[in-house]
């Protein structure tokens, strides 16, 4: 669906006490989100789901433009934490889904211009998202996210800029604490207005980021490129080429115990001993074809392919690796992935009821070559750590899924509508063990998982300005290949005993337009069977288990208010009670305990003065309640509140040049806090510290060809 902001409305009396002090804003840009659960463009107000839109220009305003954690704090239900570890990516969770991840993103489906940033098995990453190119980011929560298939506890959809006339060149630089540098260039433009055959639009960007890192042994460098080229074939069809490449070389500082964190949060003793590090190279290309078949029928086909290569050195001691079944302390991965998603949309009437149908087929596949090596060598009788040694693992893994889906939207009356859909998700794994030596036997195997995923929402328009809705759906999450890759107690082979989880969600919500702004509220409950959680994590390696039954209950509130010209305030609050409903701790009972990695309360507020030119300034404050670090709830990261300030000046020089000079300070009051936790870390090294007060300055310069 396409989410747009429009229309001037009045506040329903039931919500007036909460927002009587505010007149919500007119949005300067059209925010969009394509949600296959509801075909066709409708407004955000009319969307029967919890969804939030973050504008790309807002993300870049006086910001480093390096991590999504800089700008997504205003999204309720989304917990985004910076590990200060570029080897392991950000920690993202939506309503608690994804909190178990010790690296990368799990439990959430991510897309960039329609291409999955989530692998077919459910493992995702944010490292290839170029903030300089972002047009908007949309976060979908609740039952309808399940219609995206496997591992979709939530959906994050990134849309990049489409070039328009007149052409523009932009260069920007940022320098911050800990020796952090980012330099970027971008070019956008078009040869026509995009409606005539032969019209071409383009958006090309590149950036380089380097940092010494806040902690010891946390330096990193990243090169990122993104390109989007569109060609209008005729008045009814368009072809879009998408290219993306990222190259990361990062040290891995690892986690700290509570005592180590208090003694010196910047230390990384084991990381330096083992020289833990990770390199990642990914290149992908996509081709999207859109055609209007008739006035009532549309066709869209997306094809993509890519390769991702990773080498990681872990802090695993020598002694465990002497076990002949141990896979070693160095991981080498080579992944090739591709897919195609084709869909047809029809608009018409059925039994005199206006209806939209979207049906399609989504096919994804990935092949992985996984090798493991010892992380030490012996030279002249001396053991040298942090070097690639003998081969200890060699396997070829295949994974693919084939998902047909159908979504419908029915408009029964002017006030009552129904959105409903179903997806049949089939996921297949196959592993071929090619390292059969001595006591290390053949650990080949295969598994397949199948599940019907229905979702439906009923919406009622109380007034033109106020909609209420109720929705329900079923989600499905298989283990990722990484989660299958290791068994407990150092056993060899894949963990095919790990089962997929299923989740049933119900939600009720209310959306109210005030002026041209929006106030949203949602209540939800999710019950999960066989939830996949971290069993034990040590030395950078994590094993997983099924936790039986869990429950998530919560509430989300958000508001966006413009109370005077160029002044804007945003607020969001999330309450999430996520608990085990059965024992996930073996001999010790943790039924009723909180699921680790999830904050029970999150709050955000920001105030900005942002005229199109001249002086601007902003401030924000974030609150995070304590986060349990293990299943037993015997360790936790304390709650914290941090504030940030930014200010800058935009100067237009003649008509073509725009200069933007800015500065910011984060963690204004120099709070000491934990940025994220490593769930169930076996040596109690749960804590990944966040930096104290830190600073940054930047300059952006653009030229528009008039």
Regions found by a protein language model. Give the residues of each.
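Short acidic/polar hinge/loop motifs at secondary-structure boundaries
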Residues: 108, 115-141
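A beta-strand signature from Gram-negative outer-membrane beta-barrel systems
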Residues: 129-172
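Transmembrane beta-barrel wall of Gram-negative outer-membrane proteins
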Residues: 168, 175-210, 215-253, 277-294, ...
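Membrane-embedded beta-barrel scaffold of Gram-negative outer-membrane proteins
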Residues: 195, 288-290, 298-316, 461, ...
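Face-selective signature of the C-terminal outer-membrane beta-barrel domain
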Residues: 238-244, 279-436, 461, 519-523, ...
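Conserved C-terminal beta-signal and adjacent last beta-strands/turns
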Residues: 244, 470, 506, 560, ...
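Surface-exposed extracellular loop regions of Gram-negative outer-membrane beta-barrel proteins
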Residues: 249-263, 367-374, 428-437, 446, ...
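Gram-negative outer-membrane beta-barrel transporters
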Residues: 344-346, 351, 413-414, 426, ...
């Amino acid at each position: 669906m396409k989410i747009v902001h429009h229309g001037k409305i009045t506040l329903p009396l039931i919500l007036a006490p909460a927002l009587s002090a505010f007149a919500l804003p007119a949005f300067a840009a059209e925010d969009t989100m394509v949600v296959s659960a509801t075909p066709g463009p409708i407004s955000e107000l009319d969307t029967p789901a919890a969804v939030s839109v973050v504008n790309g220009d807002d993300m870049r305003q006086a910001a480093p433009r390096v991590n999504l954690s800089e700008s997504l704090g205003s999204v309720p239900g989304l917990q985004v934490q910076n590990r200060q570890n570029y080897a392991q990516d950000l920690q993202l969770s939506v309503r608690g889904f994804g909190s178990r991840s010790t690296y990368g993103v799990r439990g959430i489906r991510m897309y960039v211009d329609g291409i999955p940033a989530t692998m077919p098995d459910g493992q995702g990453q944010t490292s290839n998202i170029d903030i300089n190119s972002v047009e908007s980011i949309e976060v979908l929560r609740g039952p309808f996210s399940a219609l995206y298939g496997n591992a979709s506890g939530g959906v994050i959809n990134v849309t990049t800029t489409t070039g328009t006339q007149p052409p523009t060149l932009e260069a920007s630089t940022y320098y911050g604490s800990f020796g952090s540098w980012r330099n970027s260039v971008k070019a956008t433009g078009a040869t026509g207005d995009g409606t005539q055959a032969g019209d071409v639009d383009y958006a090309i960007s590149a950036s380089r980021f380097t940092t010494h890192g806040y902690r010891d042994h946390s330096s990193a460098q990243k090169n990122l490129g993104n390109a989007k080229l569109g060609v209008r074939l005729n008045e009814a069809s368009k072809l879009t080429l998408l290219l993306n490449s990222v190259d990361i070389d990062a040290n891995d500082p690892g986690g700290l115990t509570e005592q180590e964190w208090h003694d010196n949060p910047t230390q990384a003793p084991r990381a330096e001993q083992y020289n833990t590090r990770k390199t990642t190279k990914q290149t992908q290309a996509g081709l999207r074809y859109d055609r209007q078949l008739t006035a009532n029928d549309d066709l869209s086909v997306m094809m993509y392919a890519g390769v991702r290569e990773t080498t990681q050195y872990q802090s695993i001691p020598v002694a465990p690796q002497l076990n002949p079944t141990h896979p070693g302390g160095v991981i080498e991965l080579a992944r090739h992935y591709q897919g195609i998603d084709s869909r047809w949309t029809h608009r018409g009437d059925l039994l005199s009821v206006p209806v939209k149908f979207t049906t399609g087929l989504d096919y994804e596949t990935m092949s992985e070559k996984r090798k493991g090596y010892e992380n030490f060598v012996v030279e002249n009788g001396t053991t040298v750590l942090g070097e690639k040694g003998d081969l200890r693992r060699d396997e070829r893994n295949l994974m693919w899924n084939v998902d047909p889906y159908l979504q419908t939207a029915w408009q029964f009356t002017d006030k009552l509508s129904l959105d409903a859909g179903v997806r049949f998700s089939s996921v297949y794994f196959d592993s071929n063990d090619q390292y059969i030596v001595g006591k290390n036997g053949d650990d080949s195997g295969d598994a397949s998982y199948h599940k019907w995923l229905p979702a439906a929402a009923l919406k009622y328009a109380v007034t033109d300005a106020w909609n209420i809705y109720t929705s329900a759906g079923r989600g499905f999450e298989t283990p990722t290949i990484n989660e299958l890759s290791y068994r407990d107690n150092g056993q060899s082979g894949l963990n095919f005993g790990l089962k997929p989880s299923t989740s049933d969600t119900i939600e009720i919500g209310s959306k109210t337009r005030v002026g041209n702004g929006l106030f949203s509220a949602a209540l939800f409950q999710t019950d999960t069977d066989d939830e996949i959680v971290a069993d034990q994590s040590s030395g950078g390696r994590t094993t997983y288990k099924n936790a039986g039954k869990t429950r998530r209950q919560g509430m989300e509130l958000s508001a966006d208010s413009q109370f005077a010209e160029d002044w804007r305030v945003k607020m969001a609050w999330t309450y999430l009670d996520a608990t085990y409903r059965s024992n996930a701790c073996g001999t010790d009972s943790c039924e009723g305990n909180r699921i680790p990695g999830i904050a029970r309360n999150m709050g955000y507020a920001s105030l900005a003065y942002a005229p199109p030119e001249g002086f601007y300034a902003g401030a924000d404050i974030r609150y995070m309640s304590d986060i349990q670090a293990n299943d037993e709830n015997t360790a936790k990261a304390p709650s914290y509140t941090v504030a940030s300030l930014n200010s800058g000046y935009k100067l237009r020089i003649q008509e073509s040049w725009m200069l933007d000079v800015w500065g910011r300070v984060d963690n204004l009051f120099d709070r000491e806090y934990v940025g994220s936790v490593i769930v169930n870390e076996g040596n109690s090294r749960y804590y990944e510290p966040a930096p104290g007060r830190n600073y940054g300055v930047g300059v952006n310069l653009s030229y528009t060809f008039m």
